[in-house]
Amino acid sequence: MARLQSPSRLITPVALLIGLGCYVFTASADATEEDISRVNRSIFIAAGLTVGDVSTVNGGIRLSAAAIAGEVHTVNGSIELGARARVDSAETVNGGIGIGEEVIVNGAVSTVNGNIAVDAGSEIERNIETINGEILLENSRIGGDLETANGDVTLLQGATVEGDIIIADQRGWWNKLFSGNSRPLKLVIDEKSSVKGRIHLYREVELHIDPAAEVGELIEHV
């Protein structure tokens, strides 16, 4: 089975933008705990700093290890949260989200077009959602629901979803008509992982759920 890239490799375009039209926030250059907003620039928050909300329109956002921020938001760009970072929420439209080890997100994590990967020891207090992308959780906890429409879902090494897993069907009629040869999505849950709520399937899904995994009721709406 092909593995989704880990957070350290998921958002490489963000790292490449450092120094190339990227706004670098450092303690020596800027006052801490202020909101940071840009339009056509990526944003890099140095390790251990505390800032307010962070937003851009066309650019990625990267928080280094142990950085703290409020709401993190971009439209066209990826988000990378380094180990032990803390944020209120993380949201993008066109871009992936990579979450390192022992990160705490007090709210939700969401993207429309992009993968989401969460490393060991991290906690997302509310929902995690993508429409066109895969979700990978490794020994991490989701306090709300997990939802995708067009991407595989993988729970490994003791990952826990406190709410429901929802695999929606948001394909248009054109895609449904001509997708006869497309492979079904995959839902993988290993023996150490758990889903406290229900699993709702609104489209064909290939299930790889270990018999030892703790999961709730499986409901097929197809």
Where are these regions (language model features)?
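Intrinsically disordered, low-complexity terminal regions
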Residues: 1-222
